């Protein structure tokens, strides 16, 4: 088996194990992967993979501290469309407010800033999961709101 195919299988198995939310130590993850035929896996590799994929320790339904990859904390990949990170778009008399998945606001705000004044965007302010966007001169807040809806293929 090619090295990259083997690596993909390892990543797939690793993520599947974490979805089970029953592993409380890196040693348990190592053992489970070895049981699946990944003989060369060790604690150091598991530790790097946990960091790479943003795994966290949290309490499962049985109140045990376990490793998991929460969907909402997942790192956006090149295959995940940005529109999937936008949860809600609304506006008032002053600004358009965009709610995103946790951690995605700065990425989305950077995209909006890159479109600039020609698209009606004066600027953005982004937190972790919320963006304030204000219209450029000559555009109304409602114009900007509708343009952002179209950009992220949301319903009017």
From Swiss-Prot:
Q: Where is this chain's protein located in or outside the cell?
A: Cytoplasm
Q: In which pathway does it act?
A: Amino-acid biosynthesis; L-arginine biosynthesis [regulation]
Please provide an example of a Pfam family that matches this protein in its UniProt record.
Arg_repressor_C
Can you list the disulfide-bonded cysteine pairs?
none
Kindly indicate whether the keyword Cytoplasm belongs to this entry: yes
Q: Which family does it belong to?
A: Belongs to the ArgR family.
- What is the official name of this protein in its record? Arginine repressor
């Amino acid at each position: 088996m090619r090295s990259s195919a083997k690596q993909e299988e390892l990543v797939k198995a690793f993520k599947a194990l974490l979805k089970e939310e029953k592993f409380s130590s890196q040693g348990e993850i190592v053992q489970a992967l070895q049981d699946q035929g990944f003989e060369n896996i060790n604690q150091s590799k598991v530790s790097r993979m946990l960091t790479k994929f943003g795994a966290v320790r949290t309490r499962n339904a049985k109140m045990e501290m376990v490793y998991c990859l929460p969907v909402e904390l997942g790192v956006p990949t090149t295959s995940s469309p940005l529109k999937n990170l936008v949860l809600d778009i609304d506006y008032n008399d002053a600004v358009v407010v965009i709610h995103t998945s946790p951690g995605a606001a700065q990425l989305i705000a950077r995209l909006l800033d890159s479109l600039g004044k020609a698209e009606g965007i004066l600027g953005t302010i982004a937190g972790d999961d919320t963006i304030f966007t204000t219209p450029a001169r000559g555009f109304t807040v409602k114009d900007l709101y509708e343009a952002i809806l179209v950009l992220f293929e949301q319903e009017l």
